[in-house]
Protein backbone atom coordinates (compact mmCIF):
# COMPACT_ATOMS: atom_id res chain seq x y z
CA UNK A 1 0.00 0.00 0.00
CA UNK A 2 1.45 3.39 -0.99
CA UNK A 3 2.14 6.10 1.54
CA UNK A 4 1.96 9.86 1.20
CA UNK A 5 5.25 10.55 2.97
CA UNK A 6 8.83 9.35 3.04
CA UNK A 7 9.91 10.94 6.34
CA UNK A 8 7.68 12.34 9.08
CA UNK A 9 8.21 13.92 12.46
CA UNK A 10 5.72 12.86 15.11
CA UNK A 11 5.17 15.30 17.98
CA UNK A 12 3.88 13.57 21.10
CA UNK A 13 2.88 15.60 24.12
CA UNK A 14 3.76 14.28 27.55
CA UNK A 15 0.05 14.27 28.34
CA UNK A 16 -0.52 11.79 25.51
CA UNK A 17 1.61 9.25 27.38
CA UNK A 18 -0.32 9.44 30.63
CA UNK A 19 -3.68 8.40 29.17
CA UNK A 20 -6.43 8.97 31.72
CA UNK A 21 -4.00 9.15 34.62
CA UNK A 22 -3.51 12.51 36.26
CA UNK A 23 0.26 12.20 36.28
CA UNK A 24 3.09 10.05 34.95
CA UNK A 25 3.19 7.38 32.26
CA UNK A 26 0.52 4.81 31.45
CA UNK A 27 2.43 1.73 30.20
CA UNK A 28 -0.59 0.46 28.24
CA UNK A 29 -0.95 3.75 26.37
CA UNK A 30 2.76 3.77 25.53
CA UNK A 31 2.48 0.17 24.34
CA UNK A 32 -0.40 1.09 22.00
CA UNK A 33 1.50 4.08 20.59
CA UNK A 34 4.56 1.89 20.02
CA UNK A 35 2.46 -0.67 18.16
CA UNK A 36 1.05 2.01 15.86
CA UNK A 37 4.54 3.33 15.16
CA UNK A 38 5.71 -0.21 14.37
CA UNK A 39 2.89 -0.59 11.84
CA UNK A 40 3.95 2.63 10.10
CA UNK A 41 7.63 1.66 10.07
CA UNK A 42 6.61 -1.58 8.36
CA UNK A 43 5.31 0.47 5.40
CA UNK A 44 8.80 1.90 4.85
CA UNK A 45 8.10 5.39 6.20
CA UNK A 46 10.87 6.95 8.28
CA UNK A 47 9.76 8.32 11.66
CA UNK A 48 11.43 10.75 14.04
CA UNK A 49 9.70 11.69 17.29
CA UNK A 50 9.82 14.68 19.61
CA UNK A 51 8.29 14.05 23.03
CA UNK A 52 7.11 16.57 25.58
CA UNK A 53 7.39 16.22 29.34
CA UNK A 54 4.21 17.79 30.70
CA UNK A 55 3.00 14.51 32.21
CA UNK A 56 5.93 14.68 34.64
CA UNK A 57 6.96 18.33 34.96
CA UNK A 58 5.86 21.62 33.42
CA UNK A 59 8.54 24.29 33.46
CA UNK A 60 6.18 27.21 32.80
CA UNK A 61 3.93 26.19 35.68
CA UNK A 62 6.88 25.80 38.06
CA UNK A 63 8.25 29.18 36.99
CA UNK A 64 4.89 30.84 37.66
CA UNK A 65 5.07 29.39 41.17
CA UNK A 66 8.40 31.13 41.76
CA UNK A 67 11.08 28.77 40.41
CA UNK A 68 13.80 30.25 38.24
CA UNK A 69 12.49 29.86 34.67
CA UNK A 70 15.69 28.50 33.16
CA UNK A 71 16.05 25.95 35.96
CA UNK A 72 12.42 24.91 35.56
CA UNK A 73 12.87 24.45 31.81
CA UNK A 74 15.96 22.30 32.31
CA UNK A 75 14.02 20.06 34.69
CA UNK A 76 11.31 19.82 32.03
CA UNK A 77 13.95 18.72 29.52
CA UNK A 78 14.95 15.87 31.83
CA UNK A 79 11.28 14.83 31.98
CA UNK A 80 11.21 14.54 28.18
CA UNK A 81 14.18 12.16 28.32
CA UNK A 82 12.29 9.94 30.77
CA UNK A 83 9.42 9.80 28.27
CA UNK A 84 11.80 9.17 25.36
CA UNK A 85 13.44 6.23 27.13
CA UNK A 86 10.05 4.76 28.05
CA UNK A 87 8.90 4.92 24.43
CA UNK A 88 12.21 3.48 23.25
CA UNK A 89 11.79 0.51 25.58
CA UNK A 90 8.26 -0.18 24.31
CA UNK A 91 9.37 0.02 20.67
CA UNK A 92 12.37 -2.23 21.12
CA UNK A 93 10.28 -4.83 22.96
CA UNK A 94 8.33 -5.32 19.73
CA UNK A 95 11.41 -5.39 17.51
CA UNK A 96 11.61 -1.78 16.33
CA UNK A 97 15.19 -0.47 16.28
CA UNK A 98 15.26 2.85 18.07
CA UNK A 99 17.77 5.53 19.01
CA UNK A 100 17.29 8.28 21.56
CA UNK A 101 19.23 11.48 20.90
CA UNK A 102 19.31 14.25 23.49
CA UNK A 103 20.11 17.93 23.13
CA UNK A 104 21.85 17.82 26.53
CA UNK A 105 24.71 15.35 26.92
CA UNK A 106 23.64 12.18 28.75
CA UNK A 107 26.18 9.80 27.26
CA UNK A 108 25.37 6.88 29.56
CA UNK A 109 21.72 7.00 28.51
CA UNK A 110 21.49 8.28 24.95
CA UNK A 111 23.37 9.57 21.95
CA UNK A 112 24.02 13.31 21.67
CA UNK A 113 21.91 15.02 19.03
CA UNK A 114 23.91 14.99 15.80
CA UNK A 115 21.90 15.89 12.73
CA UNK A 116 23.79 13.73 10.22
CA UNK A 117 23.73 10.73 12.54
CA UNK A 118 19.98 11.14 13.10
CA UNK A 119 19.37 11.18 9.34
CA UNK A 120 21.56 8.10 8.88
CA UNK A 121 19.56 6.23 11.54
CA UNK A 122 16.33 7.15 9.75
CA UNK A 123 17.70 5.95 6.43
CA UNK A 124 18.46 2.60 8.08
CA UNK A 125 14.84 2.27 9.19
CA UNK A 126 15.40 3.14 12.84
CA UNK A 127 13.04 5.33 14.83
CA UNK A 128 14.85 8.37 16.25
CA UNK A 129 13.42 9.92 19.41
CA UNK A 130 14.62 13.41 20.27
CA UNK A 131 14.75 14.17 24.00
CA UNK A 132 15.70 17.19 26.13
CA UNK A 133 13.92 19.62 23.84
CA UNK A 134 16.24 21.96 21.96
CA UNK A 135 18.65 22.01 24.90
CA UNK A 136 17.79 25.66 25.54
CA UNK A 137 15.41 27.08 28.15
CA UNK A 138 12.53 29.35 27.07
CA UNK A 139 11.76 27.18 24.02
CA UNK A 140 8.88 24.71 23.88
CA UNK A 141 8.98 21.16 22.60
CA UNK A 142 6.64 22.32 19.81
CA UNK A 143 9.39 24.67 18.66
CA UNK A 144 11.85 21.78 18.98
CA UNK A 145 9.58 19.70 16.73
CA UNK A 146 9.58 22.42 14.08
CA UNK A 147 13.35 22.85 14.37
CA UNK A 148 14.14 19.13 14.14
CA UNK A 149 11.68 18.66 11.27
CA UNK A 150 13.50 21.35 9.31
CA UNK A 151 16.92 19.92 10.18
CA UNK A 152 16.14 16.34 9.14
CA UNK A 153 14.12 17.40 6.09
CA UNK A 154 10.84 15.89 7.31
CA UNK A 155 7.96 16.34 4.90
CA UNK A 156 5.33 16.90 7.58
CA UNK A 157 4.83 17.24 11.33
CA UNK A 158 2.17 15.00 12.84
CA UNK A 159 0.94 16.70 16.00
CA UNK A 160 -0.86 13.92 17.83
CA UNK A 161 -3.20 15.27 20.50
CA UNK A 162 -6.34 14.38 22.44
CA UNK A 163 -8.64 16.27 20.05
CA UNK A 164 -9.53 15.45 16.45
CA UNK A 165 -8.31 18.69 14.92
CA UNK A 166 -8.37 22.47 15.26
CA UNK A 167 -11.65 24.24 16.02
CA UNK A 168 -12.82 27.84 15.70
CA UNK A 169 -13.72 27.74 19.41
CA UNK A 170 -13.21 25.36 22.32
CA UNK A 171 -15.56 22.42 21.52
CA UNK A 172 -15.81 21.51 25.21
CA UNK A 173 -17.28 24.94 25.97
CA UNK A 174 -19.03 25.63 22.66
CA UNK A 175 -20.80 22.50 21.35
CA UNK A 176 -21.46 24.17 17.97
CA UNK A 177 -17.76 24.85 17.37
CA UNK A 178 -16.63 24.04 13.82
CA UNK A 179 -13.57 21.97 13.01
CA UNK A 180 -11.20 23.20 10.33
CA UNK A 181 -10.23 20.73 7.61
CA UNK A 182 -7.29 22.93 6.67
CA UNK A 183 -5.73 26.23 7.72
CA UNK A 184 -3.07 28.63 6.51
CA UNK A 185 -0.12 29.45 8.77
CA UNK A 186 -1.19 33.10 8.67
CA UNK A 187 -4.70 32.29 9.92
CA UNK A 188 -3.31 30.23 12.80
CA UNK A 189 -1.06 33.12 13.85
CA UNK A 190 -3.69 35.84 13.33
CA UNK A 191 -6.40 33.97 15.26
CA UNK A 192 -3.99 32.63 17.91
CA UNK A 193 -5.48 29.15 17.43
CA UNK A 194 -2.77 27.51 19.57
CA UNK A 195 -1.99 24.69 17.19
CA UNK A 196 1.62 25.18 18.27
CA UNK A 197 3.33 28.23 19.72
CA UNK A 198 3.99 31.13 17.36
CA UNK A 199 7.73 30.42 17.09
CA UNK A 200 7.01 26.86 15.94
CA UNK A 201 4.39 28.02 13.42
CA UNK A 202 6.75 30.66 12.04
CA UNK A 203 9.50 28.04 11.62
CA UNK A 204 7.13 25.71 9.79
CA UNK A 205 5.90 28.51 7.55
CA UNK A 206 9.44 29.60 6.71
CA UNK A 207 10.46 26.05 5.81
CA UNK A 208 7.17 24.98 4.15
CA UNK A 209 6.53 22.17 6.62
CA UNK A 210 2.82 21.31 6.91
CA UNK A 211 1.39 20.33 10.30
CA UNK A 212 -1.33 17.70 10.62
CA UNK A 213 -3.22 17.88 13.92
CA UNK A 214 -5.19 14.75 14.78
CA UNK A 215 -6.54 12.61 17.60
CA UNK A 216 -3.98 10.13 18.91
CA UNK A 217 -6.57 8.30 21.01
CA UNK A 218 -8.30 6.91 17.90
CA UNK A 219 -6.51 3.65 17.14
CA UNK A 220 -4.86 3.61 13.73
CA UNK A 221 -4.76 7.37 13.18
CA UNK A 222 -0.99 7.57 12.78
CA UNK A 223 -1.18 5.02 9.97
CA UNK A 224 -4.18 6.80 8.42
CA UNK A 225 -2.22 10.05 8.45
CA UNK A 226 0.75 8.43 6.71
CA UNK A 227 -1.56 6.94 4.07
CA UNK A 228 -3.01 10.38 3.36
CA UNK A 229 -6.51 9.67 4.63
CA UNK A 230 -8.63 12.69 5.51
CA UNK A 231 -8.27 13.11 9.26
CA UNK A 232 -7.69 16.05 11.56
CA UNK A 233 -6.69 19.53 10.45
CA UNK A 234 -3.87 20.28 8.00
CA UNK A 235 -2.03 23.55 8.62
CA UNK A 236 -0.21 24.83 5.57
CA UNK A 237 -2.92 24.69 2.94
CA UNK A 238 -5.97 26.87 2.32
CA UNK A 239 -8.47 27.80 5.02
CA UNK A 240 -11.38 25.36 4.93
CA UNK A 241 -13.91 24.65 7.69
CA UNK A 242 -15.97 21.47 7.97
Swiss-Prot record:
Cell location: Cytoplasm
Keyword Chaperone on entry: no
Regulation: Allosterically activated by GTP. Inhibited by UTP.
Coiled-coil stretches noted in the UniProt entry, renumbered to this chain: none
InterPro entries assigned: AceGlu_kinase-like_sf (IPR036393), Asp/Glu/Uridylate_kinase (IPR001048), Uridylate_kinase (IPR011817), Uridylate_kinase_bac (IPR015963)
Positions contributing to UMP binding: 53, 73, 134-141
GO BP term, pick one: UDP biosynthetic process
Keywords, sorted A to Z: Allosteric enzyme, ATP-binding, Cytoplasm, Kinase, Nucleotide-binding, Pyrimidine biosynthesis, Transferase
Recorded superkingdom: Bacteria
Enzyme class: transferase
Protein's pathway: Pyrimidine metabolism; CTP biosynthesis via de novo pathway; UDP from UMP (UMPK route): step 1/1
MF terms (GO), sorted A to Z: ATP binding; UMP kinase activity
Subunit composition and interactions: Homohexamer.
Protein name: Uridylate kinase
Amino acid sequence: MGTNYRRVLLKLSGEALMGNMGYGIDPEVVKEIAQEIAEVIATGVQIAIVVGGGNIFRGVKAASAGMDRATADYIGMIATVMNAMTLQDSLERIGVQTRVQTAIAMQELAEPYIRRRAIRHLEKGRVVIFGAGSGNPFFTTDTTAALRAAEIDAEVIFKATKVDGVYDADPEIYPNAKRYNSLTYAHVLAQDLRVMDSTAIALCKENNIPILVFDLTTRGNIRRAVLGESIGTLVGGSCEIS
